[in-house]
Amino acid sequence: MNEKDVRLMNSIMSGLGDTTQGGAVLLDVKSTQFVRVSLVLLRGLSEELQMPGIFISVDRPYQYMVHLLRMHQINPAKLTFIDVISRFSGDRKEGNANVGFVDGPFHVNSLPEALRQWSATIDNGVVNLKNCRFVLIDNLTSLLTYNNYSHVELFLRDFIEMLKSNANVLAPLMIDQERSPLLYETAKSLCTKEIVMKEEMRQVPTAASGKPYLKVADFRYVQGGIQG
């Protein structure tokens, strides 16, 4: 990561605030930048803050992110991967990382319960929410390709409620407000903070909700940096 990428990371981490408090944080990110922001978040949370976390791959098989992390010298050792897409896509390549699989993106409602069961029954296995400090999903919006909106909304509510039961778990949720306004508004109602990655960075309260609101410069920091 170059200096511009680090500046972006620092801006986002500043917006997240006290990560020990956990909770769901909404990030308004252009869909073309999901991979870049994922890498920056994983660098900041996993390496800089040494937080063990879970990365849930919905958009692409988990091996893709493992490859990008290693290519950009971001150590995936503290990460556990939950792969939602590989069994559906038929990708069977090994990524040499801790990984658990669920039965495809059409069964998204089963994911929160699967995480609960894994955490309750496995002390030192692939997934243990009790040892997790954050959970990041690569592309929430892509779930709408495989499920109707009501199922995705139910998943999102159940997912955040599950994380609330593990009070210290942070959940950054990346959604493109312009492309998925309905999902964005649903997520906004469930989150404790909103980070809008457009225009100039400034800290102001949201007019409607009064929740903390952060604007980050429109990816000028990452131009010429990480290539997703």
Predicted regions and their residues:
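Glycine-rich P-loop/Walker A and Walker A-like loops and their local beta1-loop-alpha1 context
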Residues: 2-68
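Short acidic, S/G/P-rich loop/turn micro-motifs used as interaction or catalytic elements
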Residues: 31-35, 61-62, 88-89, 141-149, ...
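P-loop NTPase catalytic phosphate-binding loop
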Residues: 63-106, 110
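Substrate-engagement module of ASCE P-loop NTPases
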Residues: 147, 151-179
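Phosphate-binding/switch region of NTP-binding enzymes
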Residues: 168-228
